[in-house]
Design a protein with these regions (language model features):
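Short, flexible, glycine-rich and Lys/Arg-enriched loop motifs at helix boundaries
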Residues: 31-33, 163-188
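Alpha-helix-loop-beta-strand connector modules within alpha/beta enzyme cores
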Residues: 1-22, 61-82, 116-142, 177-204
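Glycine-rich phosphate-binding active-site loops on the catalytic face of alpha/beta enzymes
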Residues: 41-59, 102-115, 151-173
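Hydrophobic, well-structured mid-protein blocks that either form specific transmembrane helices
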Residues: 47-103
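Short secondary-structure transition/capping segments
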Residues: 1, 27-29, 62-65, 91-93, ...
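Short secondary-structure boundary/capping elements
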Residues: 31-34, 61, 88-89, 113-116, ...
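Catalytic cores of alpha/beta
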Residues: 23-41, 85-100, 124-130, 134-136, ...
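Active-site beta->alpha loop and helix N-cap motifs at the rims of alpha/beta catalytic domains
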Residues: 1-3, 7-63
Length: 204
């Protein structure tokens, strides 16, 4: 339902994350087939792009399965997400993604945040040589987005998250139902428009 509702927003380029579970990116046959089904569903909903990633047990891009995912995406763009940063060799991984026909790779340069991996991101941009788009992401804010843009990346990903307090007036102190680690029971993650504007203003 969320995908269909998002598709109704005019002039929006819609990317859909395909990830069957949290944790690592080594998926079982059942999980892989779930990914194929979800890509088909995203296509039927009118998505412009799907975002996914799948690795082998030795920390390399699973080229065979990734090629199947790319083929399943049909005319949709395919972005390989930050599973890329978990590979044993990002330069080798980049070449693998080019071979299987990925449109784009999302990366923090193999570090926890893009600012930390900025030198590696710059190197990846050079190595890509226009064969695949490089998108920098993780830890992006108004104070560092210009530096990341200056690496020559094709795109920048950021979340601009904030916490919105619950409108509940009664808050049961005896039970935790929907709370997860790092997110209070009576709050939800939202988007901060001011943060988005501040980041975009740095790129003008």
């Amino acid at each position: 339902a969320f995908i269909r509702m998002a598709r109704r927003i005019p002039h929006l380029k819609l990317s859909v994350m395909i990830r069957p579970r949290g944790g690592d990116f080594l998926y079982s046959d059942k999980e892989f087939h779930q990914m194929l089904e979800e890509i088909s569903f995203a296509h039927d909903c009118g998505a412009d792009c799907v975002v996914a990633g799948i690795l082998t047990s030795d920390g390399r891009v699973d080229e065979i399965r990734t090629a199947e995912l790319v083929a399943a995406a049909k005319e949709m763009e395919f972005t390989f997400h930050r599973a890329f940063d978990m590979t044993c060799d990002t330069n080798e991984a980049l070449e693998a993604l080019v071979r299987v026909g990925c449109c784009r790779v999302l990366t923090s340069g193999g570090r926890n945040t893009a600012p930390e991996g900025i030198k590696n991101i710059h190197s990846l941009v050079k190595a890509s040589a226009g064969r695949i788009a490089v998108m920098a992401g993780s830890g992006v804010n108004a104070s560092n987005v210009k530096l990341l843009a200056d690496t020559g990346v094709d795109a920048i990903h950021f979340s601009a998250r904030n916490l919105t307090e619950s409108r509940m007036t009664y808050k049961n102190p005896s039970i935790s139902m929907g709370g997860v680690q790092g997110i209070p029971e009576y709050a939800s993650i939202g988007i901060d428009p001011t943060m988005i504007r501040n980041i975009l203003n740095q790129l003008i």
